[in-house]
Amino acid sequence: LSEERRVKSEEFNSSSDDVSNKNEREESEEGEGQENSSLFTHHSSLYKEQFVGESFGRINKAEAELTLLTLAEYFTKIGKQRVLSESIDVGIISPYRAQVQYLKKLIKKYEFFKPYRRLISVNTVDGFQGQERDVILISLVRSNDEGQIGFLKDLRRMNVAMTRARMKLIILGNKDTMTKHPFYKKLWEYVEGLNNEE
């Protein structure tokens, strides 16, 4: 993955090398039945968080773009017809309201998501309590050299977020920041172990 990679068009052209997106993960190419149900997609520290105020917390715009590119790849992989005919619903969760608002803005912006918008919900961790979706993407936002993760240390809340997916869980974050905390280090190692078993 080029660390400077950005979404190159509003159409999310998913048919080129632009979406090979290794992100330090390997996915099975042998069929959807063999694909792991959990992924931890790592990005570099160039994807920096920004503090935007007490009410809205933090935002990581590059990670938000990566989150939607990852979802576009997944939809493309399993096929538009299947997504729509089976009404495969998606929840995008972030602990920060600023990130939630930015993700909603991007979903409205990109034409790729127009057929799927009714199937996509974006909310905070607390906003998703008691709900499930077929696919869950979690944008962790925090990306700093100090390993500061704020209330992502509230493991009860994060555990709730991570158990909302029926089919597929995709966690997006800066591994170097997050794995300074023992819980996220174990989570990374667990998901890597799943990938290595393929």
List where the protein language model places each region.
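Short, basic, low-complexity termini and linkers enriched in Ser/Thr/Gly/Pro
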Residues: S2-E11, S16-N21, E26-L46
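Amphipathic alpha-helical transducer elements in NTP-driven molecular machines
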Residues: A64-L68, V100, V122, V135, ...
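Conserved motor-coupling elements within RecA-like helicase/translocase cores
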Residues: R117-L119, V125-I136
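A short beta-strand element within the Helicase C-terminal
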Residues: Q131-R142, I170
